[in-house]
């Protein structure tokens, strides 16, 4: 009898002890999954945020990379001269094809539209409302030229901004027989003065030039200033043909 009672007491104590140990372990088992889930979620959020930030930085770097595929070239005029830009930005023709002043960046800035930039000077060729060519430190709508292949496979370059008011005839880049640049409204596309043959030296990648207003251009000393308003263009027989937007 006593043995039975003792064994019963021992059994009760053992059960009480097991229950006492089971309770904290159960609470620990219940709390640990939630903690793990919280840690997992936090880690995932941290990982995703880092990946997103890295992706944004990568996209920003890509945007800064050169995206426009153009050429470094010499422009040989059918008159027998290479177009050249002097250090002060003045333009004329030369028969010497070895000078760096005849090197130009031909940068695509639209569909069959290019910017012509002197490699040595970094200045853009521009045409103002009177048809005069001048160098521009900034890329403006006056620096845009339409590039067209003529019947004889020579290339002609016409202003994207100005043309004859009455006839609608385009104004062209051209050199006369003495190798001097001509007013755009005096150059006819059927004449050798307007015919150029690009002689590419290498393919190059360019960043898209930032488009500025024509009024922001500051011509260099000794260079014909830009007459770019609509009034001056109409007074001189020309008119703006469109308002160019940023490409």
Curated annotation (Swiss-Prot):
Task: Select a single GO molecular function from the record's annotations and give it.
Answer: sodium channel regulator activity
One GO biological process this protein is involved in is: chemical synaptic transmission
Region (Disordered) location? 1-38, 216-247
Primary subcellular site in the record, as a coarse category: nucleus
Keywords, in A-Z order: Growth factor, Nucleus
For this record, the Gene Ontology CC terms, alphabetical, are: cytoplasm; cytosol; nucleus; synapse
Q: Where is the composition biased (Basic and acidic residues)?
A: 15-25
A Pfam family: FGF
Where, per UniProt, does this protein localize? Nucleus
| Family indicated by similarity | Belongs to the heparin-binding growth factors family.
Q: What does this protein do?
A: Probably involved in nervous system development and function.
PANTHER family of this UniProt entry? FIBROBLAST GROWTH FACTOR (PTHR11486)
> Quaternary structure per UniProt?
Interacts with SCN8A.
Q: What is this protein called?
A: Fibroblast growth factor 14
Q: Could you tell me the gene encoding this protein?
A: Fgf14
């Amino acid at each position: 009898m006593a043995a039975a009672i003792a064994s019963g007491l021992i059994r009760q104590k053992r059960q009480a002890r097991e229950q006492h140990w089971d309770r904290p372990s159960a609470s620990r088992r219940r709390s640990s999954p939630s903690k793990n889930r919280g840690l997992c979620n936090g880690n995932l959020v941290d990982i995703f945020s880092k990946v997103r930030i890295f992706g944004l930085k990568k996209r920003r770097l890509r945007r800064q990379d050169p995206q426009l595929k153009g050429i470094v070239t010499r422009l040989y005029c059918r008159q027998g001269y290479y177009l050249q830009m002097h250090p002060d930005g003045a333009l004329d023709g030369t028969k010497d094809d070895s000078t760096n002043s005849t090197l130009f960046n031909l940068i695509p800035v639209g569909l069959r539209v290019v910017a012509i930039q002197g490699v040595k000077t970094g200045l853009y060729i521009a045409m103002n409302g009177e048809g005069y060519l001048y160098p521009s430190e900034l890329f403006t709508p006056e620096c845009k030229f339409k590039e067209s292949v003529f019947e004889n496979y020579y290339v002609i370059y016409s202003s994207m901004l100005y043309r004859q008011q009455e006839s609608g005839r385009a104004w062209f880049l051209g050199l006369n027989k003495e190798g001097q640049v001509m007013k755009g409204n005096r150059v006819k596309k059927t004449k050798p003065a307007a015919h150029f043959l690009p002689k590419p030296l290498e393919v190059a990648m360019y960043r898209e030039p930032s488009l500025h207003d024509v009024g922001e251009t500051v011509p260099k000393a000794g260079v014909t200033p830009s007459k770019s308003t609509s009034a001056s263009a109409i007074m001189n027989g020309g008119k703006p043909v469109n308002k160019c937007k940023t490409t």
